[in-house]
């Protein structure tokens, strides 16, 4: 079974993988197998790997959107439940601003770089997880991740019309 690397998921989850899920269905199943191997051997789904190594760069956990899209487009793969467990795990790690995101409903700008971008990416990824939870009849996780999917609203400033950072619960004074 082929093993792939350098998915560059932050760059490809929006367009490349959804198209792959339509026209390269067998290859997508191979990608899912690689995700499963990375989960089993590395302890988490990929975020951004390079030459088979986890780099820790890029934001979000976009393998979940690739998996969700593949599932709902009917890509044959026998181990979606294992990938779903990996999705829950990666979305609940204790790093990259996730604890603050879960606590406050956004990532405070003084605690983590790229706070607004991470909040937006996590909210989308959580929406994907909520859809998988619903498909797997996992009501508690559906409710939790559906709520988290709404966190993008917490960084939208009605007065400026922009997504912007918050500092100590208030809009960051340095936003321009």
What kind of feature is each model-predicted range?
Residues 1-3:
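Conserved oxyanion/phosphate-binding beta-strand-loop segments in alpha/beta enzyme cores
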Residues 5-12, 16-133, 146:
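Aromatic-rich carbohydrate-recognition surfaces in CAZymes
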Residues 46, 135-176:
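Catalytic cores of carbohydrate-active enzymes
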């Amino acid at each position: 079974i082929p093993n792939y690397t350098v998915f560059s998921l932050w760059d490809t989850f929006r367009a490349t993988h959804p198209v792959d899920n339509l026209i390269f269905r067998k290859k997508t199943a191979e990608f899912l197998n690689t995700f499963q191997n990375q989960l089993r051997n590395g302890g988490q789904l990929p975020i951004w790997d390079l030459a088979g190594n986890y780099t820790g760069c890029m934001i979000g956990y976009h393998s979940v959107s690739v998996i969700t899209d593949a599932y709902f487009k009917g890509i044959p793969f026998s181990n979606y439940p294992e990938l779903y467990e990996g999705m829950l795990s990666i979305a609940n790690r204790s790093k990259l601003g996730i604890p603050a995101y879960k606590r406050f409903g956004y990532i405070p700008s003084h605690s983590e770089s790229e706070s607004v971008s991470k909040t937006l990416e996590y909210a989308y990824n959580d929406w994907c997880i909520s859809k998988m939870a619903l498909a797997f009849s996992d009501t508690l996780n559906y409710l939790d991740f559906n709520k988290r999917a709404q966190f993008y609203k917490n960084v939208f400033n009605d007065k400026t019309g922009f997504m912007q950072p918050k500092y100590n619960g208030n809009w960051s004074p340095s936003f321009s």
